[in-house]
């Protein structure tokens, strides 16, 4: 075996092993998404967050797993069987993904003001329509989760929630905000969420879907977060910018590496005897 043949064999098996790893990873992601979709109660008990929009994330994970498995399968079969058509398709798909990521990065960098305004509009619409459609709670649950995790209330301030119809039980009642705005650390009652509403408890199987429980709200003059989420979200993005950029660069470098290996293998295969001819 010549040095050239040895190099081709090394590239072929490297590409195969790497894609086999990502195929297994995609399978795990897909199974994880299906598990969340089918058995929500067990997953809620596992993570301890009953108000997360699990259905959305389960579908995202399932689709991501399928796409990862499909792309990895192209790389595995194309490399192992030395099929130029599959290697070319694999390279083209990776190139498309890489170009999409670059385009999104440029758009986010140049359209930050417009994106921020769009996010603000979506959040304000979610607040205005809070609990008006009990069957459509994904956006509301997502925003509750943001407020709970980032310890904030409303977009600009808690006043965003004032005068929202679903927050008042009667006209004489004062302003109220969702339970996700409640600052439990400001009190000595560590079980406040269990007492306020099952949707914020960490009781797993005892948790109920939002549309089966009364709207959970607390008085605006109680212990609530006084800062809006706009600043907290900006701070979170700033604090995690290095991690986000690092992940994006890592994914981009992986894609470039796989593209390089696949195009090298594709171009250096025997031009006279294509392995695909065996199966014609």
From Swiss-Prot:
What top-level branch of life does the organism fall under? Eukaryota
Cellular location(s): Cell membrane
Q: InterPro entries in the record, alphabetically?
A: Tetraspanin/Peripherin (IPR018499), Tetraspanin_animals (IPR000301), Tetraspanin_CS (IPR018503), Tetraspanin_EC2_sf (IPR008952)
The main location is membrane
* Keywords of this entry: Cell membrane, Glycoprotein, Membrane, Transmembrane, Transmembrane helix
Topological domain (Extracellular) residues are 39-59, 112-240
Subunit details: Interacts with SCIMP. Interacts with SOCS3. Interacts with DECTIN1/CLEC7A.
Can you tell me which family this protein belongs to?
A: Belongs to the tetraspanin (TM4SF) family.
Protein name per UniProt = Leukocyte antigen CD37
What gene, per UniProt, encodes this protein? Answer: CD37
């Amino acid at each position: 075996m010549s040095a050239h043949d040895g190099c081709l064999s090394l590239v072929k098996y490297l590409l195969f092993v790497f894609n086999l790893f990502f195929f297994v990873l995609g399978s795990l992601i897909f199974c994880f998404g299906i598990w969340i979709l089918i058995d929500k109660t067990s997953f809620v008990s596992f993570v301890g967050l009953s108000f997360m929009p699990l259905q959305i994330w389960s579908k995202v994970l399932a689709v991501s797993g399928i796409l990862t498995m499909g792309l990895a399968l192209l790389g595995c079969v194309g490399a192992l069987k030395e099929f130029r058509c599959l290697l070319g398709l694999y390279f083209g798909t990776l190139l498309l993904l890489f170009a999409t990521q670059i385009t999104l990065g440029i758009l986010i960098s140049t359209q930050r003001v417009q994106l921020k305004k769009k996010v603000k509009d979506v959040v304000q619409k979610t607040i205005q329509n809070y609990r008006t459609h009990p069957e459509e709670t994904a956006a509301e649950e997502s925003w509750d989760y943001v407020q709970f995790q980032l310890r904030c209330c409303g977009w600009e301030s808690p006043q965003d929630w004032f005068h929202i119809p679903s927050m008042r039980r009667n006209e004489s009642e004062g302003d109220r905000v969702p339970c996700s705005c409640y600052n439990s650390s400001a009190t000595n009652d560590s079980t406040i969420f269990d007492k306020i509403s099952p949707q914020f408890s960490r009781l797993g199987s005892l948790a109920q879907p939002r549309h089966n429980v009364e709207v959970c709200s607390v008085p605006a003059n109680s212990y609530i977060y006084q800062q809006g989420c706009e600043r907290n979200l900006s701070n979170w993005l700033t604090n995690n910018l290095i991690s986000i950029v690092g992940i994006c660069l890592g994914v981009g470098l992986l894609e470039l590496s796989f593209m390089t290996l696949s195009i090298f293998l594709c171009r250096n295969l025997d031009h006279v005897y294509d392995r695909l001819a065996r199966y014609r």
